[in-house]
Amino acid sequence: MKNIEKFEQLFNQFLQCVTTLQEALNVSFAEALTETFDNLENNKIKVEMGAPDEETVAKLGEMYKKLNYDELPRQTKIQVFSYLALKAVNDDGRDVNQMPTPPVLATVIALIMQKLLPDKELDILDPAIGTGNLLYSVINQLKDRNHSKNLYRLYGIDNDEDMLNLADVAAHLNDLDIELYCQDAILPWMVPSPDAVVSDLPIGYYPLDENVKDFATKSDKGHSFAHLLFIEQIIKNLKPGGFGFLLVPKSILSGKVGADFMPWLTKKVYLKSIIELPDSMFQNKFNQKSILVFQNHGGSAASSEVFLTKLDSLKSEEALVNFNVKLNEWYTKTIH
């Protein structure tokens, strides 16, 4: 059987386990997914107040046996879980902002982080962590390039408990430790000030005007843009000299919004890089994103020439190699 067919078969077996539990407990797909992986990791089916019933427990026990879960490679478990988490966002009618970030963007961000971050223990946070796939993918790539040394203490914030539970399972599957906080990230953070923030920022309007009356990026009329508020909150909370590696709407970097926002941003931080992503990655021009990299004032931070580039494609290995060559040239000339 071809690898892809094998994986499809395995995915469908996992899917059946999740939907069986979902029906028995009458919960969302995300909740059933979290509990399924908890059951498999702990090798025990959790029963609370008689649910799931004995018949379902027996049925799940047989289904779990057929998975041979303990024999599966870690990477396969992560892959299956990632696809099921994507289904959870779709099926539960969740916000489009909770859709996982394409893995190739984690590679681009990891390449930049490797150049800019100091080689020491660092606190790294995603204040809109969702299922955790962007942060974990970035950290795994940094670890791989660092001879498996894990120099990072990880933190995540989200206001959706179901997403945090999925992020918790994903961290466990990736063999990463993380502290997760359920809160509105526009309110004061409960986490320590991070050395770096990595995030695919939520896009849209923030509905609670009262919470943002002291924000410089708030709107004069009506609701404010959540993505601008997030950037301001990140800058407020980063350590002096700390870095932001953010996926942001392309529209905030130019046009009417950019005309107001960019002068404010460049007074607050040192811009390091703006990377325009391929148009083909997005359904329409309103969804287009760029990678924004900046360094907070303070510490040994200093201004430097900004690394500006557009990625025309990310479909080939060659595109990433070319990007890395340009990045190295900029780093050698400007930073190093």
Model-inferred region functions:
Residues 98, 102-199, 204, 250:
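Conserved S-adenosyl-L-methionine
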Residues 212, 238-241, 292:
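C-terminal regulatory/effector modules of DNA-binding transcriptional regulators
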Residues 223-280, 287:
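Conserved Class I SAM-dependent methyltransferase catalytic core
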Residues 87-98, 122:
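Short acidic, glycine/Ser/Thr-rich loop/turn "cap" segments at secondary-structure junctions
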Residues 202-204, 251-253, 281, 297-299:
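Conserved nucleotide-binding/hydrolysis micro-motifs of P-loop NTPases
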Residues 200-230, 251:
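Mobile active-site "lid"/loop adjacent to the S-adenosyl-L-methionine
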Residues 1-89:
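A short N-terminal interaction module
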